[in-house]
Amino acid sequence: MGVIEFLFALAQDMILAAIPAVGFAMVFNVPVRALRWCALLGAIGHGSRMILMTRGLNIEWSTFMASMLVGTIGIQWSRWYLAHPKVFTVAAVIPMFPGISAYTAMISAVKISQLGYSEPLMITLLTNFLTASSIVGALSIGLSIPGLWLYRKRPRV
């Protein structure tokens, strides 16, 4: 993939990630003045995850690093705009949730219950379930670590 194609794919990924970020921000009753920042933060998070995955990092670690970036930027923006960091960060990480792997795991579980046990279905179920669980864990831990670092009152050493 050339540089121009990568930049177009990155721009498309960021634009398509901003749409659900704004949608979920509206569901969470985020103030109207913060909607554009939720969209931008969702685009930054999903774009950074795509860059890290393109560079060879797996999806779990890429999601962890991207959610740490989202958490750090969200804390800084909350200081600038006098809002809680969750106003910006929660809606911004929703586009990174593992919908496809969770859905595939669920479908595999339904097929096992209907058709009976088979090793390929069980492998598909466990692989996708563990991937989805790891991504959700990476999102939650990565989103909470910047708050632990930046709001710490005691010295680190």
Curated annotation (Swiss-Prot):
Keyword Transmembrane tagged: yes
Residues passing through the membrane, by range: 8-28, 57-77, 87-107, 129-149
Principal localisation: membrane
Keywords of this entry: Cell inner membrane, Cell membrane, Membrane, Transmembrane, Transmembrane helix, Transport
Localization of this protein: Cell inner membrane
GO cellular component labels: plasma membrane
Keyword Transmembrane: yes
Highest taxon in the source lineage: Bacteria
GO biological process: one example: succinate transport
Its membrane topology: Multi-pass membrane protein
InterPro entries per the UniProt record, alphabetical: ThrE_2 (IPR024528), ThrE_Dicarb/AminoAcid_Exp (IPR050539), YjjB (IPR020914)
Entry similarity comment: Belongs to the ThrE exporter (TC 2.A.79) family.
Quaternary structure and interacting proteins, as annotated: The transporter is composed of YjjB and YjjP.
UniProt-listed NCBIfam families: PRK09917.1
Summary of the function given for this chain in its UniProt record: Involved in succinate export with YjjP. Both proteins are required for export.
Name by which UniProt lists this protein: Probable succinate transporter subunit YjjB
Species for this entry: Shigella boydii serotype 4 (strain Sb227)
Lineage of producing organism: Bacteria, Pseudomonadati, Pseudomonadota, Gammaproteobacteria, Enterobacterales
Gene transcribed to yield this protein: yjjB
